[in-house]
Amino acid sequence: MQHIRNFSIIAHIDHGKSTLADRLIHRCGGLAEREMSAQVLDSMDIERERGITIKAQTASLQYKSQDGTVYNLNLIDTPGHVDFSYEVSRSLSACEGALLVVDASQGVEAQTVANCYTAIELGVEVLPVLNKMDLPQADPEAARQEVEDVIGIDASEAVLASAKTGMGIDEILESIVARVPPPKGDPSAPLQALIIDSWFDNYVGVVMLVRIVNGVLKPKDKILLMASHATHLCEQIGVFTPKSQPRPELSAGEVGFVIAGIKELEHAKVGDTITLAGKPAAEPLPGFKEVKPQVFAGLYPVESSEYDQLRDSLEKLKLNDAALMFEPEVSQALGFGFRCGFLGLLHMEIVQERLEREFDMDIITTAPSVVYEVEQRDGTVVTIESPSRMPEIAKIADIREPIVKVTLFMPQEYVGPVMTLCNNKRGVQLNMSYHGRQVHLTYEIPLAEIVLDFFDKLKSVSRGYASMDYEFVEYRSADVVKVDLLINGDRVDALAMIAHRNNARYRAREVVSRMRGLIPRQMFDVAIQAAIGAEVIARENVKALRKNVLAKCYGGDISRKKKLLEKQKAGKKRMKQVGSVEIPQEAFLAILQVEDK
C-alpha cells in the first residue's frame, strides 16, 4: 500500500484537464502510441465536443520514479461543471491528492475554486499546477499570486507545465509521489468500498467504479450495497489502464471496477458503500446522499406517435445517468410526454442533445421550472414541479422557492453590469472582494431566476469573461403567483408559468403580445388573456379574417347592406362557439424567450 497514490485533477472548463490526463497516461505507458486519441478519458462524443467531462473515469498507471521504485498511480478523472458537483465530491473523497490545474494565461475561475474547496474540506492534499505555459500570454507569477489570494494555498512550489508540449510532466509525477500521502486502510478489516461512479454496459450490465477503503474484494464474493440493500454476486473485477484488465483481487487503497450482473443503475448509486453480504461492515462510508433534481421541464415528442420511442430513449439514458428522473405527463396542448427532472441547466441541455443525437428524436421542451414548496391552509406541505399542479389560491398559506448561493468571478471592468444583472434577478449581495485584477462576488439568487437565462446573460454582459458556480442553500418564502394563459376563455395548461408578483404583469404582457403574433388569424376573433386566479392582467386580440360582403351592392339601400352585415356577424358568432384554435408549437417556445425587465 505504501506504493499506491490516488489522485484526481481539478480544473475549470477548458483549462486543459483532459489533455493533461492524456499526457500522464502516455508518459506512464498506459496506451501504445497508436491508441492515443485526444482526450482518452472522455468517452462520450458530446464530452469531446463540448470539451467537458461528465462521467468520472479512472486510469491505473505504473510509474517508475527517479529513485527506481515503481509506484501505482490511480488517476480519477472528475467532472468540472457545477451541475455535477456531487459526482466531483465522490471522486475527490476516493483520493488522497488532487492536482489543481490553473490556466497560466487566465488565472483562477469560479468552478476551480468550488471544487478546490470541496477537496480541502475532504482533507485532500492539493498540488497547484500552472498549465499552458507554452502560450505567449502566460503569466505564471500573476496566476501563482491568484491561487494564493483566492484559494489560500501555498503556490510557491507550483509546477510550471504545458500539457500540449509535454513540459513539466515528469515534475508533476514526481511531486505526486513525494507530496501525496499513501492511502490508509486495513486489508484485514470487513470490506468497505466506495462507488465513485457507475454506468451501464450492454454486455455485462452495470459497471461500478470503486475505491476499496478497507478489506479485500474477490470474484465470486456475495456483495451487499448498503444504501439500496441489494445483494449481488461479484462476477469480475479489475482495473482500467484506460483499457480494462481483469485482476484476481482488489485490496484496500486500490481503485478498480466491479461487475456484478446488476441490471438497474438504481441499485448502484454513486457514493454508496459495497460490503460483503456474509461479513458486512458495521456502517457505510460517510457522505452518501440521494441526488435530487433541481430543474424540471416537460419533454414532448413532436410526432405523438413517437411517444413510446421517447420513453425507450429516456430509459436508456437513465441507465447511464442516475440523476435523470422522468414521469409521464399529459398536456391538452402538446399531447403525451414526460416531466423530467435534471441537476441543472447544463444537465438538461446534455440530455436534450443526447436524445436528439443518439436516438434521433425530435422533441419540444417546455420552459424549465424549479420545485416550489407550497404550504396549504390545512398544514400539509406539497412540492410542485410544474405550474399546472399549483393548488388554488384559496388553499395556499405560503409558497417557498429554492434559493441558491452564486459565486461569480470576473475582471474588474465588468463588475457594474454583472451586479446590475444580479439585482434584476432579485439577488442579494453577500460579499465582494478583489484579488489582483479579478473580482469575487457572492450573491443569493432564487434558482427560478437562474434557470431561465441567467448564464447566457452573464456571458453577454461580461463578454464571456465571468464564470459562475452555484449551490443550493434553502427554501424561502416568496411572493410568487401562477399566471394562467387563456385562449378564447380556455386555460392552456402547458402555457401556465410561475412568476414573482412584481414581475408577473410585465411578463404576462410580453407573453401575450408575443403570442398574438404567433397564433394565425382565424375566421373569428381570438382573445388571448393572462390571468392570476380570476383577475385578467393582460389581453390581446387576434382580429378575424373577413370577406367583404358588401362588394356586390352597387349604390343600393342601407337596409340591404345592414342585412348582409348582420348575416355575416351571426355566422361569425356561430363559428366562434364551435371553432377551436390550433396553437402552433412556436407559441410554446415564446414563453421561453420572454425577457425579464
UniProtKB/Swiss-Prot annotation:
Coiled coil: none annotated. It is a peripheral membrane protein. One of its GO terms (biological process) is positive regulation of translation. Pfam families: EFG_C, GTP_EFTU, GTP_EFTU_D2, LepA_C. It is an enzyme of class 3 (hydrolase). Disulfide bonds: none annotated. InterPro entries: EF-4, EFG_III/V, EFG_V-like, EFTu-like_2, G_TR_CS, LepA_C_sf, LepA_CTD, LepA_IV. Residues 2-184 form the tr-type G domain. It is found in: Cell inner membrane. It catalyses: GTP + H2O = GDP + phosphate + H(+). The keyword GTP-binding applies. GO terms for molecular function: GTP binding; GTPase activity; guanosine tetraphosphate binding; ribosome binding; translation elongation factor activity. Its EC number is 3.6.5.n1. This is Elongation factor 4. It comes from Bordetella parapertussis (strain 12822 / ATCC BAA-587 / NCTC 13253).
